[in-house]
Amino acid sequence: PHDNWDFIAAGAMDELTTQKNRSALDALGLRPRFLRDITERSISTSVLGTPISLPVMICPTGGHGIAHPNAECETARGAGMSDTLMMCSTSSNNSLEEIAAAATGPLWFQLYHRGYDLTEMLVKRAEEAGYKAIALTVDVPSPSPKERDLKNHYSRELELGNFRGLDKDREEISGTDETPGWQVSRVAPLTWKELDWLRGLTSLPLVLKGLRTGEDAKMAVECG
């Protein structure tokens, strides 16, 4: 349906940042070089020790159930067929264990901080399920509604698979606009103090998703 497509394609608010990103990418060009021997060639690389066949990864988004009945499990299969990395969202419709069971390629787990207890639970489950890294989202302190969704009166509350069976209010486990029916999460703020705590929870590589300044990137490196 059209409203599902708008949910997938739309950027936050009036999509100004999306437009700027598109313009920046359109401004890039390739400088082809010729008369080279390309008999042996490879575009494979690795990211934090995870080998992939090409420098393209699947970034975390929730709510894949609006596009396929098998939701994120099917996305993971597609990533495996391309021999590349998939980052699975906290807001996935399938549980992280279900996605890991379906995957044939490497997985990272994207984490929203939902307070100490829920965050620790998710990190430990990701470790046990074989995920290769934790990617903590730091640039979504509260949901940013999409104007297209508001215009369409879009609301479709799909299951949050990672919290199935937990006795928690939706506002405790939501707080992202990646899944239809989002609500603002009422949890403690995320600061560098929480990052130190999180770093001590796991030996997996820890990535901060959404940093915008060199100063913050330097602080992240210092935190490990």
How would you name each of these model-derived features?
Residues 10, 64, 68, 88-89, ...:
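Glycine- and other small-residue-rich loops at beta-strand/loop junctions that grip anionic moieties
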Residues 56-59, 84-88, 107-111, 134, ...:
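Hydrophobic faces of well-ordered beta-strands that scaffold small-molecule active sites
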Residues 52-91, 96:
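Glycine-rich active-site/cofactor-binding loop and its immediate structural neighborhood
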Residues 63, 76-77, 81, 98-102, ...:
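Alpha/beta enzyme core
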Residues 2-52, 146, 153-190:
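An N-cap/entry alpha-helix motif that binds or orients negatively charged groups
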Residues 92-93, 111-115, 140:
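Short, acidic/turn-prone active-site loops that include or flank metal/cofactor-
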Residues 102-111, 116:
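Long, hydrophobic, well-ordered secondary-structure blocks that form the structural core
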Residues 2, 11, 15-19, 69, ...:
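Electropositive phosphate-/nucleotide-binding environments in soluble metabolic enzymes
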